[in-house]
Design a protein with these regions (language model features):
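N-terminal signal peptide c-region/cleavage motif recognized by signal peptidases
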Residues: 13-15
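Sec-dependent signal peptide recognition
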Residues: 1-7
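C-terminal soluble interaction/assembly domains
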Residues: 282-346
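Structured, acidic catalytic/metal-binding patches in enzyme active sites
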Residues: 20-284
Length: 346
């Protein structure tokens, strides 16, 4: 679900507000390239060392073959609506068009009029008397300032921090402020893939129920997982983010250097919040990646055995020993990388 954490380790915000930094000039990139000057030499060396330790850390496009020879494909997405991210390689687009099934993390199209009505009322997104307030979660005060500014920018008002439930707040934090400019006009890459599949006659498979994330966080009651997710995603609101940082993170994605993106997150939280940062990230990843990967695989298994599936999930779901590449191999599938032009070699 995460895109990247475009922050230099150790850089904390000045007086700039969390919403005002996300201007069109910062957000709408003309090109993506790595800017090595944004890293200290020591940080970059540690980043390279850590990324080399992450299994299956290079590549976005993978062929999946069952023991009976049925072929499917998996693509690591970036949850972004930038044209450079929406511009998929021809080989990927052709595979989507030919797919029997296009599977995405969540199919958010409404299935009934009742679901549509419920999505507009949002009554369960308001905090009741039994739920903890985000202000009482003992989070760093700077994070609360960034969150409050973000909520104001989204139109929730300056009191939303007090009346939204922890689950609703965590879910709202998932949206990148830089996506605001094209919201409702340009789809994020995942939604474009789903749309292409639908246009070309593919069946759409939702790998997870639409409200699964919200329900998980609601059941958590604002405890460990929800608090950790709020802390992690509040850091995406850091006003220290620059266009060079965003350019670098997008370049790493387009070059298939996914392990470096994940290592960047790890090192940032270890250095910026040495006491709690690693635990925040670990708790978040344990659910968003590790636990949900098992759900995704279970949802797709029968169709993968038959073949013809194009599975599109956030690119962080692919690497690591708990990633989908490793889980698919453990389940008996052959998983081979399809290297694309411009991507790095392992």
């Amino acid at each position: 679900m995460r895109l990247w954490l475009a922050l230099i380790a150790g850089v904390l915000a000045g007086p700039t507000h969390a919403q005002t930094w996300a201007t069109r000039e910062v957000c709408l990139l003309d090109e993506a390239r790595v800017h090595p000057e944004i890293f200290t030499p020591a940080f970059y060396a540690n980043l390279q060392t850590r990324s080399a330790e992450i299994p299956n850390s290079v590549g976005r496009f993978w062929r999946i073959t069952s023991v009976d020879g049925a072929v499917s494909h998996m693509w690591g997405t970036m949850h972004s609506s930038l044209p450079m991210i929406l511009r998929l390689p021809n080989q990927v687009t052709d595979t989507i068009k030919a797919a029997r099934i296009v599977a995405t993390e969540v199919d958010y199209t409404q299935q009934t009029r009742e679901e549509l009505s419920a999505s507009h009322t949002s009554s369960d997104r308001y905090r009741d008397a039994t739920e903890i307030s985000v202000r009482d979660m003992a989070l760093p005060s700077q994070l609360l300032i960034w969150i409050e500014e973000r909520l104001i920018g989204l139109g929730w008002g300056d009191e939303a921090l007090d009346y939204l439930s922890p689950a609703a707040l965590a879910e709202l934090m998932l949206a990148d402020p830089c996506g605001d400019f094209a919201a409702g006009i340009y789809p994020i890459q995942d939604d474009r893939i789903q749309m292409l599949g639908a246009i070309h006659g593919s069946k759409i498979l939702s790998l997870e129920a639409p409200r699964a994330l919200f329900q998980k966080l609601s059941d958590d009651g604002g405890a460990g997982l929800t608090r950790a997710m709020i802390a992690v995603y509040a850091n995406y609101l850091n006003p220290a983010i620059t266009q060079e940082m965003r350019s670098t993170s997008h370049a790493l994605y387009l070059q298939g250097r996914i392990g470096e993106m994940m290592a960047w997150d790890e090192l940032y939280f270890s250095e910026a919040y040495p006491e709690e940062g690693p635990d925040w990230l670990a708790r978040t990843n344990d659910y968003l990646l590790r636990e949900r990967n098992e759900v995704f695989l279970g949802s797709a298994m029968a169709d993968l055995l038959e073949g013809g599936v194009f599975m599109a999930v956030g690119t962080y779901h692919l690497p690591q020993e708990y990633g989908l590449i490793a889980l698919l191999r453990k389940a008996g599938f052959a998983v081979e990388r399809i290297a694309l032009e411009g991507e790095a070699r392992p």
